[in-house]
């Protein structure tokens, strides 16, 4: 069920996105209905009343990922306390945390037989710890049921509160992921409640603690290639090992307008550049998202 808050205009803009080029047009395939992994994942999530960033953020890769029996669980409800101009997750006043949610995430992951679980959350600035303890509890119960499963946490910045970050560190995720999302100049327009330096600080602290760190950017929001490269150097400077680069796709006419559709050759150029400056893995392409083929990104190193 679509949250009615998603229908509220996200910005003052009212501009339909330009037609997508061929390389961004996703071809949907419909497997055998008797053995349909997409339906299996959807039924598992609906049965457990779980949210995913796949649906809440209108990800273009939903069918592809679900056909591989992978999904990114989204904790804390489906209402975010922040209002980024590009994001399709509903914004507003969230409900109280569902204390049974961690258990249901674990049950779903076990039922799907996942070997790599990605767990994220909406921003919960209304909570003292930003939802960190809820992350930790979820990791604990998933590990109990799937001891050999790799766990990747895609976390908010927690406003760089040391106590919140320490809760995350104590649960020892296999991958610590925090997306910077865009270049420094665009933060006031794209993510006005976030700060570029704050995101870098979070990643630096995690790297210094010895965690495998990962971040990502969305391109096509008005940045230049040189600004992207500058951001990549900033990320290397704070110890980030894995990077994802993908194309911004405008969810509705009231969201931040797409400024450009970045050519596949530019994504390739940025991948090569990222490898040259020290990233262990750079997953770069128009339809790449932070958790797209996340299980492969850890070892993906062409």
From Swiss-Prot:
Enzyme class: transferase
Record localization: Cytoplasm
InterPro entries: Aldolase_TIM, Elp3/MiaA/NifB-like_rSAM, Lipoyl_synth, rSAM
Top-rank lineage group of the source organism: Bacteria
GO cellular component: cytoplasm
CDD domains hit by this protein: Radical_SAM
Known EC number: 2.8.1.8
Residues bound to [4Fe-4S] cluster 1: 54, 59, 65, 291
Residue ranges of domain Radical SAM core in the record: 66-280
Protein's pathway: Protein modification; protein lipoylation via endogenous pathway; protein N(6)-(lipoyl)lysine from octanoyl-[acyl-carrier-protein]: step 2/2
UniProt GO MF annotations: 4 iron, 4 sulfur cluster binding; lipoate synthase activity; metal ion binding
Cofactor note: Binds 2 [4Fe-4S] clusters per subunit. One cluster is coordinated with 3 cysteines and an exchangeable S-adenosyl-L-methionine.
Family the entry assigns: Belongs to the radical SAM superfamily. Lipoyl synthase family.
Name of the protein described by the UniProt record: Lipoyl synthase
Organism field: Leptospira borgpetersenii serovar Hardjo-bovis (strain JB197)
Lineage: Bacteria, Pseudomonadati, Spirochaetota, Spirochaetia, Leptospirales
């Amino acid at each position: 069920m679509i949250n009615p808050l998603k229908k509220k205009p996200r910005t003052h803009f009212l501009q339909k996105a330009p037609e997508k080029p061929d390389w961004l047009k996703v071809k949907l395939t419909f497997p055998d209905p008797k053995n349909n992994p997409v339906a299996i994942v959807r039924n598992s999530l609906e049965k457990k009343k779980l949210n995913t960033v796949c649906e809440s953020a209108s990800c273009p890769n939903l069918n592809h990922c679900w056909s591989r029996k992978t999904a990114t669980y989204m904790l804390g409800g489906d209402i975010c306390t922040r209002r980024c101009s590009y994001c399709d997750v509903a914004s507003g006043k969230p409900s109280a945390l569902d204390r049974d949610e961690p258990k249901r995430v674990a049950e779903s992951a076990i039922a799907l037989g996942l070997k790599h679980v990605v767990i994220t959350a909406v921003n919960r600035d209304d909570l003292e710890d930003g939802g960190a303890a809820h992350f930790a509890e979820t990791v604990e119960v998933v590990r109990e049921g799937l001891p050999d499963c790799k766990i990747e946490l895609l976390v908010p910045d927690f406003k760089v509160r040391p106590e919140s970050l320490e809760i995350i560190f104590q649960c020892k995720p296999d991958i610590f992921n925090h997306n910077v999302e865009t270049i420094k100049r665009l933060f006031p327009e794209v993510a006005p409640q976030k700060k570029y330096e704050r995101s870098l600080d979070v990643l630096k602290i995690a790297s210094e603690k010895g965690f495998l760190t990962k971040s990502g950017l969305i391109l096509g929001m008005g940045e230049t290639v040189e600004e992207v490269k500058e951001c990549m150097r900033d990320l290397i400077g704070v110890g980030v090992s894995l990077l994802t680069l993908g194309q911004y796709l405008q969810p509705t006419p009231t969201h931040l307008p797409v400024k450009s559709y970045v050519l596949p050759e530019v994504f390739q150029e940025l991948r090569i550049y990222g490898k040259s400056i020290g990233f262990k893995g750079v997953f770069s392409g128009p339809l790449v998202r932070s958790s797209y083929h996340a299980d492969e990104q850890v070892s993906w190193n062409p």
